[in-house]
Amino acid sequence: MTTLTTSSARTFTGDRDHSSFGFAVRHMTVSMFRGSFGDVDARVVIADDGAVELTGAVRVESISVQSPADLRAHLLGADFFDAATHPEITFRSAPARPAADGSIEVHGDLTMRGVSRPVVATGTLLGPVEDPFGATRAALELRATIDRREFGMTWNLPLPKGGDALGTQVELLVHLELVAD
């Protein structure tokens, strides 16, 4: 594996066809419910000193879940993402420096439902490589855990023998394939 190095600042744009933003949350205390957003917009700037800065957004309406349409509608509604009022989820990072092995810790602000909170994501920066068509590509894979209640997502139902139908800790999974501008 090589780490991303540059001789001058470079901007990389997310390849929408090869990038994803997913989430997973405990369901009925025994399984994980997973979903993703298909419309991911990301930009990564690699500074001369190797510092990495990420800005990104996803369109909430692009949510995809392996569930009935009424559940998708519930997720898009006011109990969860409130897509009509808040159509985007955004993230803006502070500069971060990858380690020699490509591992990286990214600190930034995540905004959902009009609420911004600091988030720390960990992951890996891979590349660069030249693709068969002459473009320079890299990848950024990140994971973070948030408490959905901090973003106003408090909906839940109690289970008959204790516990809640939906967990509060949500794992965010970001996979960005990046193309140099």
Report residues per predicted region.
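Low-complexity, acidic/polar, glycine-enriched regions of mature
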Residues: M1-D181
